Amino acid sequence: MQSYLLLFCFALSINLLPGKSSFLGGRLQQNERKAPVALFDGKTPAGWRGYDSTGFPSGFWKIERGELISIKNAGAGAGKAEAVDLITTKTYKNYVLELDFKLTNHANSGILYRVVELKNRPSWHGAPEFQLLDDPAYKAEGLKDIQMSGSDYDMYAAKSKVLKRTGSWNHVKLVVNGNHVEHWLNGVKVVEYTLGSDGWKKRYALSKFASYPEYGKQATGYIALQNHHEEVHFKNIMLQEL
């Protein structure tokens, strides 16, 4: 009995040494990870509101067939308001976001993360963007790879071209964990980078965001779906906090 007790105490002391983690501790960390939750119930705008506003921007977004849909040309034209992005009512820090999206012809949109609301300024002035784009249409108009689907817009080009044909559903996985970010498109990791790294700072200085000091500096923020005056469909929006 005494030998078993000594063996137990020795094993316990090893697990408590600096740099060591116990099996129980690992199990607790795994069990404490939050389960994925739906950010969109498919029926109501619960959990969402307009950027820099309090209510759901029904003139710019609609809900049909279990989908969130940006309304084409809403707010476009001389003398009319800018299109309104849709943002979560809660802020998030570290998470995995997954969703499905479908582009229409000439569609342009994005998923912005760690969004901060800037008075009288758009969401993209402060937040990185997972670009969603009808690539063939805009490639013909001269846009660059760093502006195509899957890219961290104007910062990191997508490494692979895996966007499906216009009108097909695509799947996004976005990992934001501390300063580490991953963009996944249709099961392929197309972008990986570190916010605030030396490489990131060099790209930032050469980007269109260089004159926006808030860009990419937030440790937490809202998640936004961009309305860029084109019709884009979103569904199955799930988030797991890390």
What are these regions (language model features)?
Residues 1-30:
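Bacterial Sec-dependent N-terminal signal peptides
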Residues 21-242:
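Carbohydrate-interacting regions of secretory-pathway proteins
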